[in-house]
Amino acid sequence: MTMSAFDLTKQSTRCTKPEMDCVFPRMKVRDETFTFIDGKWVNEVHCQPTFVPQRRLLSKKTENEWSIWEENRALWEENQVLRIENRMLWEENKALQYLQSQNKGVQLVYSDTIQQSLQKDHKLSPFFPERHLGFQVSPGNKALQLVRERSSVLEFFHRQNRTVPTIWKDQQAIVVHEENKGASSVQKDTENTTAAGEGSLGPTCQEEHDAKEESTTPTQNDTKIAPSTEDDNEILQALQDLYQILRVFLKEKCLSDDRESLHALQDESKFFQEEYKKLKLQLNNVKNTVSDITTQMEMLEKELIAITFPIYEEAGKNMANEYQLGEM
């Protein structure tokens, strides 16, 4: 393309408020406009900056990528927490398997009153999901909070459909004693007397019987409330003892593991010490052989010097004689 092809008359020479120090010449050919920049005619389409919609698309893309990155980071942190919890549960399961393999456990012995209270109540406890306990868990009780933290330990036994083992403490089994037989017998007697009275009463004495029932109901309610609280205290005490015993056995397991690891480390240290001694002996042998070789090399060097020295002397004398003869 030559300069004659351009229409120089249509060149735009007007320039209001230039943004640069110099104004680049422009020429229009057909529907395209060229600008002279750095010694070249360049199409203005290639010199225009990016449009605003493109910038918006790029910003939206970066925002989406940033949100995805934040979600990935949150999921990663949650995964780390779940791994830690899984590790803790695995260690507890391992400790319980070790205790189960040892013949150190006995079964908890429940009294008749506690079994009756367990059967009467229909509220499940988080500690024993297969049994019915007659008390509610209060968040303020520290002992229950501690037992709740170790509830996963007890869930293992319920999954296996086995009774919860305890440990011989001072060669005696921890047994839940019966303390409310008198209260339960009083309840049974009162129930039997009321049933017999209902069977013997006639239609004429119905009003008197109703009055007697109203007078006896509060006493029966009081007798029902008292043994339930005592049973709850007994169950809480048994759970506290169980938790303490489990802690003791976990400590013993940790101590046994530490001892085993200590013995293993001692054996490894002994093995490495023996290997070190062997390597040291080999190093001394190598040093001795190297010193012998160096002494032999020195002796050979001296012998070579003794042999070659007279030969070099004769050759030097011959060269001196030839040089003298050549000068003459």
UniProtKB/Swiss-Prot annotation:
Keywords: Coiled coil. Residues 180-231 are annotated as: Disordered. It comes from Gallus gallus. Residues 259-307 form a coiled coil. The keyword Amino-acid biosynthesis does not apply. The keyword Coiled coil applies. This is Protein chibby homolog 2. Residues 206-215 have a biased composition (Basic and acidic residues). Residues 182-195 have a biased composition (Polar residues). Pfam families: Chibby (PF14645). Belongs to the chibby family. SPERT subfamily. It comes from the Eukaryota.
